[in-house]
């Protein structure tokens, strides 16, 4: 119905989505929630969305005659120190006759409403699908078989087989990702190390310039894939993804610092240069299959050789000494330094051990709490924002003080 170039997000296969039984689901306490995840504007004040195809999300459980509805704009605000701050709008899909604009007939003009319909839909009919209770049902992933919204909009990747646990995992990921992403350099580095770290920083900057960004849902999917295909997302600990670190058996790489920082530890990036590719692991390893009660176990034995004349040989040896069977230990330069002792000069008025008279401390004004800011929201905005997840601003990843090899990762 609407025109415009899609943003390249029409992935297949189309999921079969079941939206309730003969009666529409009851509406939850947080308001009229959409069955589907939102599309989000990439910046403020963009025009209303246009779609390459019909604009109706894929849903094989709905009759073709009822494949019509509307996208509704929902303003979003993020609490801040100086008051609430607007963030790009979100648009939610509702079937005709449901949701906040349930009293409108298809095609009636109203600000913030975009009507869409699939080919062959009876726009005079009204849907009996109701709306979603967020306390009982997760949002369904968006899929568009005939083309999605234009390039001013995006939506987060949600796996089709996501369970109810995805919400709490995403929340814990968001909390851990708020940790400071930069640390001061410790100690002095050699010229070669400085050059390597500069190259590592350039790699990350180039990736960030290209717009590489991992959403909360994508990070959760990365951490909960099949074990052999998992990768550690930003903000995750090693043991959150691959289990506790051990000694003398599988899972024995990583000291306590690496376990806590995950990929933020620069030694991870350096060591990945020594890890075989999938093809190298398959065709260059000694493969040993073994049938076990729980299934087929495949063991891959691969040897990576770092020549002694390699410029980073000493750095790789140091990383292995620290991280192989490193559970319970930390790098020496990461341990807290003892406070320097005062010089043993005779006491004078200037350095007398007698305590100085302290000035009274000024009382700090209490910061404005988020709940006070939330009081400035209208009831309609509170209802709208109840089903929204604010996007975290991309963090600059610190790759640490260790070596990086010649190959870009």
Swiss-Prot record:
Localization in the cell: Virion; Host endoplasmic reticulum-Golgi intermediate compartment; Host Golgi apparatus
Q: Which stretches does UniProt call biased (Basic and acidic residues)?
A: 180-192, 368-384
> Phosphothreonine is carried by which residues?
378
Q: Does the keyword Transcription regulation apply?
A: yes
Q: Which residues fall in a compositionally biased region of kind Polar residues?
A: 57-68
For the region RNA-binding, give the residue spans: 29-160
Record keywords, A-Z: ADP-ribosylation, Disulfide bond, Host Golgi apparatus, Phosphoprotein, Ribonucleoprotein, RNA-binding, Transcription, Transcription regulation, Viral nucleoprotein, Virion
Q: List the disulfide bonds.
A: 320-323
PTM description: ADP-ribosylated. The ADP-ribosylation is retained in the virion during infection. Phosphorylated on serine and threonine residues.
Q: Name one GO cellular component term.
A: ribonucleoprotein complex
Task: Give the compositionally biased regions (Low complexity).
Answer: 164-179
Which residues lie within the region annotated Dimerization? 226-333
What range(s) does the CoV N CTD domain occupy?
A: 215-331
**Residue ranges constituting the CoV N NTD domain according to the UniProt record:** 31-156
Main localization category: virion
Locate the region Disordered.
1-32, 47-84, 121-145, 164-194, 326-409
What does the annotation say about its assembly with partners?
Homooligomer. Both monomeric and oligomeric forms interact with RNA. Interacts with protein M. Interacts with NSP3; this interaction serves to tether the genome to the newly translated replicase-transcriptase complex at a very early stage of infection.
Q: What does this protein do?
A: Packages the positive strand viral genome RNA into a helical ribonucleocapsid (RNP) and plays a fundamental role during virion assembly through its interactions with the viral genome and membrane protein M. Plays an important role in enhancing the efficiency of subgenomic viral RNA transcription as well as viral replication.
This chain belongs to the protein called: Nucleoprotein
Q: Which gene encodes it?
A: N
